[in-house]
Design a protein with these regions (language model features):
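ATP-binding N-terminal substructure of ATP-dependent carboxylate-amine bond-forming enzymes
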Residues: 1-80, 84-85, 117, 292
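A short glycine-rich, hydrophobically flanked beta-strand micro-motif that places a catalytic Asp/Glu
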Residues: 38-40, 172-173, 182, 242-253
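Short acidic active-site motifs
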Residues: 42, 120-122, 154
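Short glycine-rich anion-binding loops that position phosphate/pyrophosphate groups of nucleotides
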Residues: 58-60, 139-140, 264
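Phosphate-binding site of ATP-dependent enzymes
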Residues: 144-237
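C-terminal active-site "lid" helix and adjoining low-complexity regulatory extension at the edge
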Residues: 238, 251-299
Length: 299
């Protein structure tokens, strides 16, 4: 029997679907014969009592979640997410460069520092990559500080705003699609596959439609997912490390392009677990037993 801790924060349990997901992790642990407790920021001193830690809180190198990951690693405990995954995924420049080195297909991408955010550079990039362009701040999350620009003056205005948060920005080719694939992976294995279908006339999952409608999450059984989709997702995840990842992918004319690799991927009840309800047990098995517990999964 293993003693497992889930580090979370108060804001995480304000959402019913996330609270239910946390409960599902606990039920899965009990059914597998393990103990699982929720640990909050003011209870970190008790983490030494546990064998492994699952982080279900906002991750960033400046957040408590990163301290938890580093501490667990220094104590020799298994932890999700790893500190390496947090560092890489919270810096999109680092993440995209790793994907490029691993020859993972991504949209055409450029990195600009402050001196390059000019209308002249914008004109050249519109000619090279098309219109619109997507600008991203390196440390953005949940689609914040990610914007489309259609004119040089718009490019400069948004770029300079993003540079208040970082010393570089990411510029990418825009790939229009009706949905994004999300493949959740762990240690070279596929845990779940979903489609995030955008609201009408929207291009980001977090955007609501004109009538207030939200994006729709549709679960896809792992064995029904396109093999090339899974191959690309696993390659992208491996380019970061072997932690728990949510790989966002666009399908364009039968080709797959990685949009992002996310650490600490959302696992919400009735959404990411739709077609793969065993995801909770798989994560618990990994924490309690290690990578060998995932040998039966595709990957």
């Amino acid at each position: 029997m293993a003693r497992l801790a889930v580090f979370t924060e108060r804001y995480t349990i304000r959402s019913s679907v996330e609270l239910t997901a946390l409960t599902n992790f606990r039920l899965a642990a009990f059914e597998l014969g393990h103990e699982l407790d929720f640990v909050f920021k003011n209870e970190l001193k008790y983490l030494a009592q546990y064998d492994a830690v699952l982080i279900r809180a906002l991750t960033d190198p400046l957040n408590t979640a990163y301290v938890v990951a580093r501490w667990a690693e220094m104590m020799g405990k298994r932890v999700l997410d790893t500190s390496e995954s947090i560092r890489v995924c919270c810096d999109k420049v680092n993440m995209y460069r790793r994907l490029q080195r691993a020859a993972v297909p991504i949209p055409e991408t450029r990195f600009l520092d402050e001196g390059q955010v000019t209308e002249a550079v914008a004109v050249r990039l519109f000619e090279e990559l098309g219109t619109p362009l997507v600008l991203k701040a390196p440390n953005s999350s949940f689609s914040a500080y990610v914007d489309k620009v259609v004119a040089p003056e718009h490019f400069v205005r948004v770029g300079k705003r993003f540079l208040r948060r970082a010393d570089r920005i990411v510029v990418q080719q825009y790939l229009p699609s009706a949905f994004d694939w999300r493949v959740i992976t762990l240690h070279g294995k596929v845990l779940a596959v979903v489609e995030y279908r955008f609201a009408a006339d929207r291009w980001k999952v977090m955007q609501r439609g004109a009538e207030g409608e939200a994006a729709i999450t549709r679960g896809v059984p792992r064995d029904a997912a396109p093999p090339e989709l899974l191959r690309v997702a696993l390659a992208a995840s491996a380019a970061v490390d072997d932690s728990l990842h949510g790989v966002d992918i666009k399908e364009i004319d039968g080709q797959y392009y990685v949009i992002e690799v996310n650490d600490n991927p959302t696992i919400a009840a009735t959404e990411e677990d739709q077609a793969n309800p065993e995801i909770y047990a798989e994560v618990i098995r990994y924490l309690a037993e290690g990578p060998s517990a995932l040998a039966h999964l595709p990957g």
